[in-house]
Every structure is written in C-alpha cells, then in structure tokens.
UniProtKB/Swiss-Prot annotation:
Name by which UniProt lists this protein: 2-dehydro-3-deoxyphosphooctonate aldolase
Keyword DNA-binding in record: no
UniProt-listed HAMAP family: KDO8P_synth
Domain of life, per lineage: Bacteria
GO biological process, one term: keto-3-deoxy-D-manno-octulosonic acid biosynthetic process
Catalytic activity: D-arabinose 5-phosphate + phosphoenolpyruvate + H2O = 3-deoxy-alpha-D-manno-2-octulosonate-8-phosphate + phosphate
Subcellular location: Cytoplasm
GO molecular function: 3-deoxy-8-phosphooctulonate synthase activity
InterPro entries on file: Aldolase_TIM, DAHP1/KDSA, KDO8P_synthase
Similarity section: Belongs to the KdsA family.
Keyword Transferase: yes
Amino acid sequence: MAQKIIRVGDIEIANDKPMVLFGGMNVLESRDMAMQVCEEYVKVTEKLGIPYVFKASFDKANRSSVTSYRGPGLEEGMRIFQDIKQAFGVPIITDVHEPEQAAVVAEVCDIIQLPAFLSRQTDLVVAMAKTGAVINIKKAQFLAPQEMKHILNKCVEAGNDQLILCERGSSFGYNNLVVDMLGFGIMKQFEYPVFFDVTHALQMPGGRADSAGGRRAQVLDLAKAGISQSLAGLFLEAHPDPDNAKCDGPCALRLDKLEPFLAQLKQLDELVKSFPTVETA
C-alpha cells in the first residue's frame, strides 16, 4: 500500500519513514520555560537523529474548570513561537480552536492542529484546510477510527491534502481512555501519516476535582505499544516539573527523562520498520 509523504521543511513524514517527533509542552506557561523545553528537545533529538517539530498550545479552550490556566493567548503565543523559530530553527505545531484563528496561526506555524473535541466542526475544518497548511487531525475520543475518513474528505474537498491523522485514545466509560491498537491499521489504510499522542492517551478525563488526571508512570509502555505499529511519529509532552505544570501534568514526561525515553523508542521504530511486509488478509 503506497503511503503518502507529507513534507515540513526538510522533514519527510510517512508511515514507512523514520519516526518524527511532535514534542514540547502542553501549554505555553512562559517564554522562558518554552525556550528551556525546546532547547532540551532540540539537544536530545539532534543527538539521537530524530526529526523534530516543537509543540505547545497558546490557548487551552476546553479546560475542566473556568478558573484553570488557559495560556497567553493568540498574539503573545505567536510572538513566543516566532522567538522559538528564530532561536532554534525548528518547525512548530499548535492547535486552532476557532475558524478566525486559522489564517493567523498558519502564518507563523508550520503545522496547525485540529483538536479532538472539535474534529467534526465543519466550519473550523474548512477554515484550517483553506490555509494550505499541513493539518494534524486529532481523532476524537468518541469517533471510531474509520470515521476519520469523513474529516479527511472535508479537508480534501476544501483543497488541502496535506494531512496527518493522530490517535489519542477512546472513551472507555467515565473518566477513562483506552487505545485500540487495531485502529492504527484502519487509519493507515487511508494512506496518510498516522501519529500517536501518547500523552493524552494517558489522561483520566475529569479524574480530579477540577482537572484531568493521568498515568505518567505508564507512558513508556504505551509509547512502545504505539510505535510497534509502524507509525509516522509520536506526539509527546514533557515538563521540567510535571507535578506543578499548569495543564496535564499527570500525563507529562519529566523533561530530564527525555533522552532515555526517546532512545528506546527510536530503536524500536528502526526495528519494526526493518521487517518485511507480511500479507495476512
């Protein structure tokens, strides 16, 4: 099965290419912390030879509580992203929540992300597609993997086939998510690159009084399971002090564990992609 290649600068993204990392922090907490986090990712990915795109949100529009930290907002967020690009020369991915934000974000960021909760919002999907930017489509927790085809079709009908699919877990009763490993193969049949958001797959939505809980201790186990499916890449969030992070700390990898974590996943990715295809249908 031919796999579509998406290019972001010098990076080639495809299910049969070396693993690409979309990595960073959940939300921009400050310019200095964003610089610190990106610097560590750049250092580690350059050492390991992993193609890298920096990830952070400028606004978390779907927090559990009205008092929860949301981020610096659109204007300040774009300024921070521009500073990061200038300092480190890395591509950037961030999420868009409203149609009016799409064009503004696409002027600065190399990949724009369609949030899982909003992935069926046609006006937002079309506005993002019309920017011509590469789009990372998060699979909603309530969607079957085969339903992602409808979102792909909306983008293509709007004139954009520069698309990536991203698994982030499925609702499993209340306050819990599970990852259906069979879903990766279903989405790969669409021939677009498929990523695994291991961070948010670890969430326990509403698991704490006013925010989501998480299962950080299992991040390596779940990441290995995902990468074993021969994917285009991994989506990962890390933090210098996860216990005090302003959003999704319970799911975030400790930043000082980034190198040993990625070293194992790179070896696994290389091993899996060295195997010949076996037709089992």
